[in-house]
Amino acid sequence: MPRQFDLEHTRNIGIMAHIDAGKTTTTERILFYTGRVHKIGETHEGSATMDWMEQEQERGITITSAATTAQWKGNRINIIDTPGHVDFTVEVERSLRVLDGSVTVFCAKGGVEPQSETVWRQADKYGVPRMAYVNKMDIMGADFYNVIAMMKDRLQCNAVPIQLPIGSEDCFVGMVDLVTMTSHIFKDDLGQVIEDQPIPDDMIEISNKYREQLLEAVAEQDEELMMKYLEGEEFTLEEIKAGIRKATIAVKMIPVTCGSSYKNKGVQQMLDAVIDFMPSPTDIPAIKGISVDGDTEIERPADDNGPFAALAFKIMTDPYVGKLCFFRVYSGTLNSGSYVLNSTKNKRERIGRILQMHANHREEIQVVHSGDIAAAVGLKDTTTGDTLCEENNPVILESMEFPEPVIEVAIEPKTKAGQEKMGVALQKLAEEDPTFRVHTDAETGQTIIGGMGELHLDIIVDRMLREFKVEANVGNPQVSYKETIRKAVKSEMKYARQSGGKGQYGHCVIELEPREPGAGYEFVNKITGGAIPKEYIAPIDAGIQEAMNTGVLAGYNVVDIKVTLIDGSYHEVDSSEMAFKIAGSMAFKDGCRKANPVLLEPIMKVDVSVPEEYMGDVMGGLNARRGRIEGMEARGGAQNIRAVVPLSEMFGYATALRSSTQGRGTFSMQTSHFEEVPKSIQEKVISSRTTGV
């Protein structure tokens, strides 16, 4: 089947912003104007097409990235609407990885808000070309020029307006187009009747000033245009458009448009700018990958005739078709029913059906081409970040890295019958979301779930109830401590039982000594002359390892110990494997008590990014949490602080950081190593563990 839109007329864009800047409302208007929806949905009414999960409609926020496709003036635009809440940054991260460009929505009143900075840094990481749309020009306190200043200051970017608003708040009636130097005035509520007029007299001076800035920004990217500019020659309309496009794709300039999505003003002009200035799949560099053996770098340019290569960027469980895998095609074509290679896992997969997604509606298609974003049904082993490619031309595309969970809680089903259902539900949810982890605590036997924040885990528990009908109790966050010893000791233990008939007899002498942190457990057998028969050596080792699961201080796992078996004795009749296993366990416990046992706690590597004015408060806060500052650096208009802090002190840090930086600070953390717990805190941990208080 021939492609409907060639690559030059295809755009893959994301819509990103701070929570409540109006992303989803903007996407709804795009769908309305491009003819995908015949009635506009509103987020505050819970009827937005893109917010299709029940929790999204209730909370009025976007949680998952909904993908949809639209058509505008003979072009196809694939749009991904991403969440603005910090707990769901993984959705933004994986969307950016497969997009060619993005529209960042700013609130005309709030300007550059904290999540805007986070999202901007993520887009910088992937080198994504961007344009900005200043939304909510109709609300009280709207200030377009302040937003431009904040973008330059906080995001360190070259923000260049290509439109200026005519009026603001209640008087926002249209905009000046700085490319054509005309004005667009909106004459109806739906924003479909637009009159082109000369620039109003009171705006001629400011329009000329910003037009000059635009021409200068365009000239800087092109030597020929710079010569023309310096000689005072006029640019043609085509030269200006080509110059803006070139600078935008090179991420040297951020074109800025304005409007009010809720009042239906400015969205069509923003769509025109997407077509004019955002890259097509052929404008971006060829995607790089490596050969399966990892030796050779391979490039895959956007070309329908090239070998098929795609990246799976999202897994979703759909109530009707089961597991859906969203993927972006970088080169080649793919037919439904065909086989592909998952080169990341070296598994052959069959593409059952291919679906073009429109928020939560779907349309079955037979073939996808390079540059397309679609969803496949029938992939069994594919997860987020996997490469799908032609079996004869394998390639592994650069995958995505996801942050480690920063919060963990214990969870249990409310009923015994829910145990199995909960296991299935958690497995499916973990497949969908790479930042959500599940494991069983060996000490307590509890199921522990980890995620990016409390809202993240709230939504997971909520989805378990709605989608899988599992009710669960959720505990408070816990730290998993470890135990070890600080000095070498010798321990001897004899286990003897006589109760008529065959008795039990096991006797061993062991030496315990501490090992380097992270070195683990080592068992050495130094028995000579048959003091203990060979068949009883392994049971002694097994008994010791079993005893290591519950330490002598507070019942935590024991780590980093070397045990040497040096002597012992046995009884011809009464000795057994069980007797020696018990003797080994008892000797180990006895030795630990004498070997100066200590508690170890997990230490986290913490990265905090804050505006400079909050540095003192934040560093003081980290010190108060027993943190050690390891370094600082300026990064993208913010200060980045690196520290190591005990995990037990990090609970509640997200809230503390938010309040001490007015919501502008962000942090991430991952486990670094284990360290000895200070004596005063060790006593508290032991008493709370033994008394349960």
Curated annotation (Swiss-Prot):
Pfam families: EFG_C (PF00679), EFG_III (PF14492), EFG_IV (PF03764), GTP_EFTU (PF00009), GTP_EFTU_D2 (PF03144). One of its GO terms (molecular function) is GTPase activity. GTP binds at residues 17-24, 81-85, 135-138. Its main location: cytoplasm. Keywords: Cytoplasm, Elongation factor, GTP-binding, Nucleotide-binding, Protein biosynthesis. InterPro entries: EFG_II (IPR041095), EFG_III (IPR009022), EFG_III/V (IPR035647), EFG_IV (IPR047872), EFG_V (IPR035649), EFG_V-like (IPR000640), EFTu-like_2 (IPR004161), G_TR_CS (IPR031157). One of its GO terms (biological process) is ribosome disassembly. One of its GO terms (cellular component) is cytoplasm. Residues 8-282 form the tr-type G domain. It is found in: Cytoplasm. HAMAP family: EF_G_EF_2_B (MF_00054_B). Belongs to the TRAFAC class translation factor GTPase superfamily. Classic translation factor GTPase family. EF-G/EF-2 subfamily. Catalyzes the GTP-dependent ribosomal translocation step during translation elongation. During this step, the ribosome changes from the pre-translocational (PRE) to the post-translocational (POST) state as the newly formed A-site-bound peptidyl-tRNA and P-site-bound deacylated tRNA move to the P and E sites, respectively. Catalyzes the coordinated movement of the two tRNA molecules, the mRNA and conformational changes in the ribosome. NCBIfam families: EF-G (TIGR00484), PRK12740.1-3 (NF009379), PRK12740.1-5 (NF009381), small_GTP (TIGR00231). This is Elongation factor G. The gene is fusA.
